[in-house]
């Protein structure tokens, strides 16, 4: 059984190959990379707002929106979900040197 991320990504790829006139995914592909990137930025802002408002229900929805738009970007750039999963797998369990990372200032 395929997981929800795989099913979503396959649907997005199908829309890219066989556009449907009323499809939002098709709309994004027709507008191109700049529109897709703009939507990712907008959705990331909405994630921040939902988190700052302590609205977990809205936060979940906005994170799903970010993931969807990132998946559209992956399809636009011809990057497979498998490429992403391989990178996640490679990074999983690796030790990270916190001292090498720039400190995050409070907002």
From Swiss-Prot:
Keywords: Amino-acid biosynthesis, ATP-binding, Cytoplasm, Histidine biosynthesis, Hydrolase, Nucleotide-binding. Its EC number is 3.6.1.31. GO terms for cellular component: cytoplasm. Disulfide bonds: none annotated. Pfam families: PRA-PH (PF01503). It is found in: Cytoplasm. GO terms for biological process: L-histidine biosynthetic process. InterPro entries: HisE (IPR008179), PRib-ATP_PPHydrolase-like (IPR021130). It catalyses: 1-(5-phospho-beta-D-ribosyl)-ATP + H2O = 1-(5-phospho-beta-D-ribosyl)-5'-AMP + diphosphate + H(+). GO terms for molecular function: ATP binding; phosphoribosyl-ATP diphosphatase activity. Its main location: cytoplasm. Pathway: Amino-acid biosynthesis; L-histidine biosynthesis; L-histidine from 5-phospho-alpha-D-ribose 1-diphosphate: step 2/9. NCBIfam families: histidine_hisI (TIGR03188), PRK00400.1-3 (NF001611). Belongs to the PRA-PH family. This is Phosphoribosyl-ATP pyrophosphatase.
